[in-house]
């Protein structure tokens, strides 16, 4: 099935010409009156204009968030939970529409937005609705005369900066726990994909008290920086590049603002020789696991962009990979048969092609792809790159630096010790994959890989109840899982003495 182009007569999606900020439950024009053009990576054409916000707009959003905080933070956990459930239901009833919006704004295949992005977005709201209903403070008797208990309380007004690779899902990762905890939010979407969250607010805005969620659009260096440097936020959450994350942390540190940051990765996908002990469905799953590096066009922070394969199976492994890659269907993101869509922007497209050239220049062997995959007709202006495979060594730039595109760098290892060394030989520590039939190898590797998430015999699973976050330069803090609530709460300890006699010290 091929969905009609948005704004066409037969499409269910019609974008407005201009999108404003969403502040205090209302759509507000930017203070400067300026807007920026928003381009679809599907065809390279501008399809709307979006508010280019400044610090004045951020201040208005913070005013609204502060005004709403007292009421929202004292709303019962039951009512907050019910609102999150209603949000999930509303998204679910508009799933197909939002999937089209997300694909057009980002360039990803609609089969992914229909089957992954939107269902996971819905599930995260439902999960945190359940978490806040079941959260309990700890209480204990210290001695026969002293009782203590702990109260989780909303941390306050939260600034959230969202990346462009999963606009709605990454918003849900941050919004759901923050709202559940009783916080109010000022959210800044990525300027590359600003419309998805605005479309969402048109759908769910009536379910949320005014000022609880505020969306301010614009460039990171303007609106994003104003939010990150504000002294009026009580918490900052950011997902994006390590370079920008470093700047964000410095801004927050100047104001002693607690921060959660999820940054880059260069994740290894490790294949042990026993995967070839049988020609079965498991082996087929292993090969598919390697190609998951092309999921979302490789624009995933945990992208398994480094494949480490045992030298004894290298030739057989590569033959199967090439055979499978050649069958990948790339093209129209609105076609449900499409497996790889367009890169998010011209800037990202050029960056990826630049890294492909670096790989060639530094002597890596180009095994497959390595060039644009130009489309025809109305897709001709889009940003499409052929899935690319390189063979090289772990010190090359294409092994050490995050490309964020459909590029896999492959190398060999001789034993488990070398595999572990190669896996950990990176400044990043976000994710890793281990593929083996041997449970002992699986446990040893999972324990010793320095990464926040290790997938064993699977990859790219992101359930709401599994904690996500990085080691090393891949981030600080965790998202998803109930422990995320603690990032949006202060813990108050109450210590009560029922001893009537004084201490006798003074």
Curated annotation (Swiss-Prot):
* Annotated metabolic or biological route of this protein: Alcohol metabolism; ethanol degradation; acetate from ethanol: step 2/2
Q: Which gene encodes it?
A: aldA
Could you tell me what reaction this enzyme catalyses?
an aldehyde + NAD(+) + H2O = a carboxylate + NADH + 2 H(+)
- Report the EC number(s), separated by commas if there are several: 1.2.1.3
Offer an example of a GO molecular function term for this protein: aldehyde dehydrogenase (NAD+) activity
The UniProt similarity line reads: Belongs to the aldehyde dehydrogenase family.
- Name the positions where NAD(+) binds: 240-245
Catalytic residue list = 262, 301
Top-rank taxon of the source lineage equals: Bacteria
Recorded hits in InterPro entries, A to Z, give: Ald_DH/histidinol_DH, Ald_DH_C, Ald_DH_CS_CYS, Ald_DH_CS_GLU, Ald_DH_N, Aldehyde_DH_dom
The record, for PANTHER family, names: ALDEHYDE DEHYDROGENASE B-RELATED
Gene Ontology BP, a term: ethanol catabolic process
Any idea what job this protein has?
A: May be involved in V.cholerae virulence, as its expression is under the control of ToxR, a transcriptional activator of several genes associated with virulence.
From what organism does this protein derive? Vibrio cholerae serotype O1 (strain ATCC 39315 / El Tor Inaba N16961)
Q: Does the keyword Transmembrane helix apply?
A: no
Keywords of this entry:
NAD, Oxidoreductase, Virulence
Q: Which SUPFAM superfamilies match?
A: ALDH-like
State the protein's name: Aldehyde dehydrogenase
